[in-house]
Amino acid sequence: VFSFEFMQNAYIAGTFIAIVCGIMGVYVVGRNMSFLSHMLSEIGFSGASFGIFMGWPALNGMLLFTIVSSVLIGRMSVQASRREAAISAISSLFLGLGILFLAISSKNVSYATNILFGSVIGISRQEVWQVLVLTIVALLFIFFMYRSLKFDSFDHIGASVKGIHTNLVSIIFLVVLALSVSTAAQVVGSLLIFVLLTLPASAAKFVSKTVSGMMLFAVIAALIGVWLGLYLGYVTNWPVSFFIATIECAIYFGALLFNKNK
């Protein structure tokens, strides 16, 4: 398997994506933002369409659209009751723009549509370096804001009482989430991002009672899904996304049964 450069690239990129999605997923689940992570991944497709229309690298368009939309959502959804409406409004706007740019672009648009499904087997060494750099940036943000993020995600009222600037923390978190989604979507696809951001972390809630324990389990679960999915995709020539999604679902239901039988 590792004698081929494309598989080496796939495993390296997949490993970093699994790590950042596993860690970010714990906060996504803790903040009840699974729907937002799904919408950001689709907005990434719109950003790729815009980038291609402008003659930019698709990643630049993805970063622009996801970061701007996450900041707008953060500003509009200060109250939790407004969050879903804000997410729906902003995502509808950006998805509409993406479809428009895809329709009027005279350039190669196949890459933009590939963003929906990903092409982890076809990733280049340059894209591996992009994933590596952006993943490190996202993890550094998480590391330096670990205490505030943990407090705000799992005890929002307590964080406000303690004087933590919860609005600022939320916006920074959304920007880091946008960065993570843009990094991973170009490799594993927008549709699979939702799986890696939610299922490992959701399973971790059933087997661990601490945030650090949830992160460890979520990262391991994401790594198992990506590594095993890549191998099975290689030997069967079936879509890697199918195997990763199936494995993560199996881990989730296994954790659910474990929790019920305790």
Question: What spans do the regions from the language model cover?
Answer:
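Membrane-interfacial amphipathic/re-entrant helices at transmembrane-helix boundaries
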Residues: V1-I19
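Short loop segments and helix-boundary regions at transmembrane helix junctions
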Residues: V26-N108, A204-L216, G233-V235, N261
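Membrane-helix/interface signature in polytopic inner-membrane proteins
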Residues: L140-F173
